[in-house]
Amino acid sequence: MGLTKQYLRYVASAVFGLIGSQKGNIVFVTLRGEKGRYVAVPACEHVFIWDLRKGEKILILQGNKQEVTCLCPSPDGLHLAVGYEDGAIRIFSLLSGEGNITFNGHKAAVTSLKYDQLGGRLASGSKDTDVIIWDVINESGLYRLKGHKDAVTQALFLRERNLLVTSGKDTMVKWWDLDNQHCFKTMVGHRTEVWGLVLVSEEKRLITGAADSELRAWDIDYLQEIDDPEEPEPKKIKECPGIQDTPESEDSTLEADDEKSEDRILSCSKAGSIMREGRDRVVNLAVDKTGRILACHGTDSVLEVFCILSKAEVQKKMDKKLKKARKKARLNSANEEEDPETSVSMTLQDEILRVAKIKTSAKIKSFDLIHSPQGELKAVFLLQNNLVELYSLNASLPAPQPVRTSRITIGGHRSDVRTLSFSSDNIAVLSAAADSIKIWNRSTLQCIRTMPCEYALCSFFVPGDRQVVIGTKTGNLQLYDLASGTLLETIAAHDGALWSMSLSPDQRGFVTGGADKAVKFWDFELVTDKNSTQKRLSVKQTRTLQLDEDVLCVSYSPNQKLLAVSLLDCTVKVFYVDTLKFFLSLYGHKLPVLCMDISHDGALIATGSADRNVKIWGLDFGDCHRSLFAHDDSVMYLRFVPKSHLFFTAGKDHKIKQWDADKFEHIQTLEGHHQEIWCLAVSPSGDYVVSASHDKSLRLWERTREPLILEEEREMQREAEYEESVAKEDQPAVPGETQGDNYFTGKKTIETVKAAERIMEAIELHREETAKMKEHRAICKAAGKEVPLPVNPILMAHGNISPSAYVLETFKGIRSSELEEALLVLPFSYVPDVLTLFNEFIQTGLDVELLCRCLFFLLRIHFGQITSNQMLVPVIEKLKETTISKVRQVQDAIGFNMAGLDYLKRECEAKSEVMFFAEATSHLEEKKKKRKNRKRMILTLT
């Protein structure tokens, strides 16, 4: 066997430079008993918990690979539900930061998550148009609600009734009866997508936000209240003065007429509209926990805040209005003998008042509201430019003014990072964007310097790591001092964008290339500072090489004899540095070369192009050694690992790949970024790689000591592709359901397939062991003595348990959320054995609840085959008897426990009442004593 080249694996080390991703929503979370101080923010595949007071990241909820799209804290504040791009939902504990519960049911990104009032159920809406209700306590799905024709945008539980209301991009608002999982009402009064909805006024009013500047209000009348004869007729609210009889309002009246027969549980009628100041669509619509503050925003940077008055406040307002109207009427009819009859009508504007506007520093992506203990309204915003802002507002004042109380900025750039560099000691990392330069400590990932700059395109640390040079989009060179964090000098270098710079190997100067078709050579020099007597670093231009095309990239050879220049005409030209004479032309790319690098020994040059290819050339003759199809989109950056012929490429396909330039092999792919990668940097030691992407994140990759074998890597890649294909296969057909309609809550994943395989293996083992035991009994009978039975090593590893107990342990080991899907994949040939074993287990009273759940599901999906199988008839008869008796026993035990808990509750309440009265009497006695003491003091003074 020949020697194989050994590579070392690079792994993801950390994500930094990111405050919050744009796809998800920001929410307040309760930590350490404090409300309003901590917020959870989506950060690519993770969730960051930020302390708003200190501006620090205090907890990271680790995700897998998919991007976070939705967050929802539980009512008790102990858990956080997180929805992902692939449709998965994970529930994290905010105490430990671990995600123990995973729900897989949606086929597309999760768009909405909402807990019910007690936190026992979770409703999730998705881009796959389905709504799924999950049982959080049992860690399983309850049912899937199908009806929307486009992505679901919002789902809300009603507090007092077992109902759910959902909105979607299909312009529909649907009401669901959760007792029978049926959509009993569809509201079709919207002409555009419904982006949000809230319930206010004790759930008797629904407010919806669509793709226009209106917030529509709908009155909800519940059946029980309509049927109650003692209930007075609700007041008819007039529509806003600005709303005419539009075709939409006609539609809503037609809808009301047509749906009278459908009003089994409730009826909806349009109450009017509130006009927003923004003209674009509603992005987010929310109400605070008190139900008094309503807020919404569009695609701009303004949050509009409204106050919803209570019945008493509205009545008070109406009384004032009526009094004013009567006074006016009396003045107008002073000559008439009879008092005129006056009446006032209540409009929607009397009930919902505009309070204030909160203007943020950038476009709002999401927000959340909370009331502080002092009564102030706090609004936290996740902005488009990687920023979190907190505003406070006292809504009780006549003209409240929002005040910005906190801001998290230092942890990231406001725009995409376009250039990265490592210091010579591998410790500092420079990142530069459109408005600022940041210096990061690689070990702590903390930002240690922030300096304002122009739109940066390229950068490097000056030898000595005390200064940095930036090349900008306007063609300037900017020189910064790191110790003071100041701009030393700005030099006009090029007439167009300065696309690339390369430090000379002798470290005395550098070369720049720009869009003005020029390559310029610069030397470092010391000049006297005007503001002080000390000398400072500066640069001076020495030579210029004029070319026929825009320069995109420049690179020195390590011996400083050659200079490679990439041009807009898709070629790379190589020149002698000393004479600037032409040496080689490297042509073959179909689109311009965006990046290139020369190996440490000067033997190879690798070029990456917008045509998605990487070409490896020899620098001696300019021959192309190999052309590699590297990425699925443009190759944006290319760097050799120091002192090797290995190089990294970064592409717009969100991937970083490592290649061997000698063997022309793909070594590994570093996946993590969710959008285009703009740049990367390799540390001088080669141990670290840092990359920047359009998803605003900076990622650090670290070289481990783990050897990477290419054959194993290819095998792992094939396994991953197979697992992906298994998950994409169609669901097994269930009798009674049409093809393509899946009303079960789960979906087929590789985990459910593996769970089904574990059940099959356990049943096979049970069959084998049962046969062995029969043989063993026959041998013992023939021998007339007890012969030792060989023990199965698997059973011995589980504590020398019986084969049937091993089957039960296998069922108990399957996740609750994956149980139904695993049973759905299980072939029918194993079902008779499973039913027989279930009968044994239930008779002994083992895990009755779990086994009944499995049993009823198997009976449901294999009903036809089970009933037609004569051999299973006695088993089913026995199961019928045992399940009824054992379930009753469990029911009785639960009833007894509930009665016991009720008794304890009453005892505690009685004790607390006694304590309350005891405290009250002691307070009264203390007050009497104080009064007596005061009287004595007064008497002594007199």
From Swiss-Prot:
Acidic residues biased stretches: 247-260
GO CC, alphabetical: nuclear membrane; nucleolus; nucleoplasm; small-subunit processome
WD repeats: 21-60, 63-102, 105-144, 147-186, 189-228, 277-316, 412-450, 452-490, 493-532, 546-585, 588-629, 630-669, 672-711
Lineage: Eukaryota, Metazoa, Chordata, Craniata, Vertebrata
Functional note: Part of the small subunit (SSU) processome, first precursor of the small eukaryotic ribosomal subunit. During the assembly of the SSU processome in the nucleolus, many ribosome biogenesis factors, an RNA chaperone and ribosomal proteins associate with the nascent pre-rRNA and work in concert to generate RNA folding, modifications, rearrangements and cleavage as well as targeted degradation of pre-ribosomal RNA by the RNA exosome.
Modification type Phosphoserine: residues: 249, 725
Pfam family, one: Utp12
This protein's UniProt keywords: Isopeptide bond, Nucleus, Phosphoprotein, Repeat, Ubl conjugation, WD repeat
Name the record gives this protein: WD repeat-containing protein 3
Keyword Nucleus tagged: yes
GO biological process: ribosomal small subunit biogenesis
Subcellular location: Nucleus, Nucleolus
UniProt entry tagged with the keyword Nucleus: yes
InterPro entries: G-protein_beta_WD-40_rep, Quinoprotein_ADH-like_sf, SSU_processome_Utp12, TBC1_cilium_biogenesis, WD40/YVTN_repeat-like_dom_sf, WD40_repeat_CS, WD40_rpt
Family: Belongs to the WD repeat WDR3/UTP12 family.
Superkingdom of the source species: Eukaryota
Subunit structure: Part of the small subunit (SSU) processome, composed of more than 70 proteins and the RNA chaperone small nucleolar RNA (snoRNA) U3.
Gene, per the UniProt record: Wdr3
Cross-link Glycyl lysine isopeptide (Lys-Gly) (interchain with G-Cter in SUMO2) mapped to chain: 473
Disulfide partners: none
Region (Disordered): 230-263, 723-742
